[in-house]
A protein has these predicted regions:
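A conserved acidic beta->alpha catalytic loop
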Residues: 25, 40-49, 92
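Short aromatic/hydrophobic "clamp" motif used to bind/position activated sugar donors
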Residues: 88
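Short beta-strand/loop segment that forms part of the nucleotide-sugar
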Residues: 33-42, 63-68
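Short, well-formed alpha-helical segments that are part of the catalytic scaffolds
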Residues: 15-28
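Conserved donor NDP-sugar-binding/catalytic core segment of glycosyltransferases
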Residues: 100-135
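Cell-envelope/extracellular polymer assembly enzymes that use nucleotide-activated donors
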Residues: 4-7, 35
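Glycine-rich, basic loop-to-helix element that forms the pyrophosphate-binding segment
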Residues: 67-83
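Conserved nucleotide-sugar donor-binding catalytic segment
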Residues: 129, 135-175
Length: 175
């Protein structure tokens, strides 16, 4: 198997009932250059067994870590620590991805030169309810590269999907 380029990270706590939907969306990805990294923050439901079944399916690359309940920020920091890909994207257990999400992100990233990548902390993408309806407003016209705060200062409203360079997240862990 090829080296993966992006980690889809999911912190979870007692969300076994929701993980299957996300798993199904990951199996449908048109690009498989990702791994799914799950940090279980002390679940007492069927999360561990469910993830073990996903791993046995062997359809996508999955890494699973269990920690005693410590909070989402601690789970996030562990995810970043255990990540071995250039890019890191947090996708919550109650979310799912469009079939081309990984492909779209990687195509965008691959167009950047190494020098350009060092100037960027990552990629901001739309989040939506489905492929037709985004959450909030479109990005301001002409703002292809900007700091996140500048997007919002220039009229962007609503939630976004954030894909970060893993090395940047390592420099700035959650307190």
């Amino acid at each position: 198997r090829r080296m993966k380029e992006i980690t889809i990270f999911t912190p979870t706590y007692n969300r076994a009932n929701l993980l299957t939907r996300l798993y199904q969306s990951l199996k449908m990805q048109t690009c498989r250059e990702f791994q799914w990294l799950i940090v279980d923050d002390g679940s007492t439901d069927d999360t561990k067994n469910m993830v073990e079944k996903f791993i046995q399916d062997d359809e996508i690359a999955i890494k699973y870590y269990y920690q005693k309940n410590s909070g989402k920020h601690v789970a996030h920091n562990l995810g970043v620590k255990m990540c071995d890909t250039e890019l890191f994207c947090c996708v919550d257990s109650d979310d799912s991805l469009t079939n081309d999400a990984v492909q779209t992100v990687l195509e965008c990233w691959r167009k950047k030169t190494t020098d350009e990548k060092t100037l960027l902390s990552g990629i901001v993408a739309y989040r939506g309810y489905n492929t037709e309806k985004i959450i909030g407003t479109e990005f301001p016209a002409g703002m292809n590269e900007a700091a996140l705060k500048d997007l919002y200062a220039n009229g962007k409203k609503g939630d976004t999907a954030l894909v970060y360079r893993t090395d940047v997240l390592r420099q700035y862990p959650f307190p």
